């Protein structure tokens, strides 16, 4: 799931997944962090989910995927679209 908050100069985007599916650490990897694994690792929240928040520029499109333990890449089903290999997010 993706939670968004529009800001005056951009968007605050929170990527949310269940706390234990998939198991192990998960990070969101995309063009906004130069596709660097571990740059934005999802952390547990008190509501039984895990999440990470990033700030992105307004009126932009970003490609991203999730990376879990064991080199398991997967997409966000609630993204704004897909470009074949990646999920897309519009701010």
Question: What are these model-predicted stretches?
Answer:
Residues 1-9:
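N-terminal edge beta-strand
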Residues 9-59, 69-91:
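Aromatic-rich carbohydrate-binding modules that target alpha-glucans
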């Amino acid at each position: 799931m993706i939670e968004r908050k529009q800001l005056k100069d951009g968007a605050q985007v929170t990527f949310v997944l269940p706390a234990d599916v998939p198991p192990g650490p998960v990070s969101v990897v995309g063009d906004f962090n130069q596709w660097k694994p571990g740059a934005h690792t999802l952390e547990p929240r008190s509501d039984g989910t895990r999440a990470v928040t990033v700030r992105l520029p307004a009126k932009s499109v970003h490609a991203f995927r999730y990376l879990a333990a064991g080199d398991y890449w997967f997409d966000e089903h609630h993204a704004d679209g897909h470009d074949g290999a990646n999920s897309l997010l519009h701010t």
